[in-house]
């Protein structure tokens, strides 16, 4: 199994605890899916914790420390703090996969907005009251397809 790791020299803007999490993940040879199952959370939510883009509950911290063999004192206060979301990603992104996601919004953002406005009215899709997941599908020829599902609460603009 190929596992994602973190090269802290290339990602100096991430919080220090990110390296601890990734070191524990690598030493235990665990995927985000396996860690997510242990925490009872989604893979994407767990990956966001590892990059410092999400806040962990005390239960998350305890389970992570137990699973990854990290002393709780090293993580508890830092991982329970308020995250600095969005830090560490250049705009436009340089990583090819992240750039493709950016490109999807560039190419289809107006179309998504138009269809959503017609279906829901004037407003926005929340990225706070939000969930997302990634699935893998194989077509009839055996080609792998990435399926990204995003679900956000609709927030209508208010008149004032």
UniProtKB/Swiss-Prot annotation:
Keywords: Lyase. It catalyses: cyanate + hydrogencarbonate + 3 H(+) = NH4(+) + 2 CO2. Disulfide bonds: none annotated. It holds the Pfam family Cyanate_lyase. One of its GO terms (molecular function) is cyanate hydratase activity. Its EC number is 4.2.1.104. It comes from the Eukaryota. GO terms for biological process: cyanate metabolic process. The active site is at residues 100, 103, 126. SUPFAM superfamilies: Cyanase C-terminal domain, lambda repressor-like DNA-binding domains. Catalyzes the reaction of cyanate with bicarbonate to produce ammonia and carbon dioxide. HAMAP family: Cyanate_hydrat. Belongs to the cyanase family. This is Cyanate hydratase. It comes from Arthroderma otae (strain ATCC MYA-4605 / CBS 113480) (Microsporum canis).
């Amino acid at each position: 199994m190929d596992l994602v790791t973190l090269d802290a020299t290339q990602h100096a803007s991430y919080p220090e605890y990110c390296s601890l999490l990734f070191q524990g993940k690598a030493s235990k040879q665990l995927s985000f899916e396996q860690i997510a199952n242990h925490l009872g959370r989604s893979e994407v939510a767990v990956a966001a914790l590892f990059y410092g883009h999400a806040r962990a509950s005390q239960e998350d911290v305890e389970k992570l420390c137990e699973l990854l063999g990290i002393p709780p004192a090293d993580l508890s206060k830092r991982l329970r703090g308020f995250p600095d979301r969005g830090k560490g990603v250049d705009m436009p992104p340089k990583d090819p996969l992240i750039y493709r996601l950016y490109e999807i919004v560039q190419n289809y953002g107006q179309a998504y907005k138009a269809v959503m406005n017609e279906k829901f009215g004037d407003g926005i899709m929340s990225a706070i009251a939000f969930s997302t997941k990634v699935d893998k599908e194989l077509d009839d020829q055996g080609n792998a397809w990435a399926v990204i599902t995003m679900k956000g609460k609709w927030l209508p603009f208010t008149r004032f």
